[in-house]
Swiss-Prot record:
It is a multi-pass membrane protein. NCBIfam families: integ_memb_HG (TIGR03954). InterPro entries: DUF3817_TM. This is Uncharacterized membrane protein YdzA. It comes from the Bacteria. Keywords: Cell membrane, Membrane, Transmembrane, Transmembrane helix. The keyword Cell membrane applies. The chain crosses the membrane at residues 14-34, 38-58, 67-87. It comes from Bacillus subtilis (strain 168). GO terms for cellular component: plasma membrane.
Amino acid sequence: MLHTPIGRLRTMGFIEGMSLLILLFIAMPLKYWAGLPLAVTIVGSVHGGLFILYLLVLAYATFSVKWPLKWSAAGFIAAFVPFGNFLYDRGLRNYK
């Protein structure tokens, strides 16, 4: 899966998507319900780094595959929506 630019993007999208879900559904409740703001600090920092890495891999895939702008824009928007990367991955799975 890591042998192609799209495979790398799919892998990074999964990792970044999981970090967003961990931030939203584990770290945020720990901050507000359990009074542990350090959880958001740590997970948020990791997620931020993964998000930047995801954008770099998205740019790499965009220029390597030379696909239309709509695929790049969809990948960018999907990164901001919970479960968005997983839906985007469904489209990438069938991309030739």
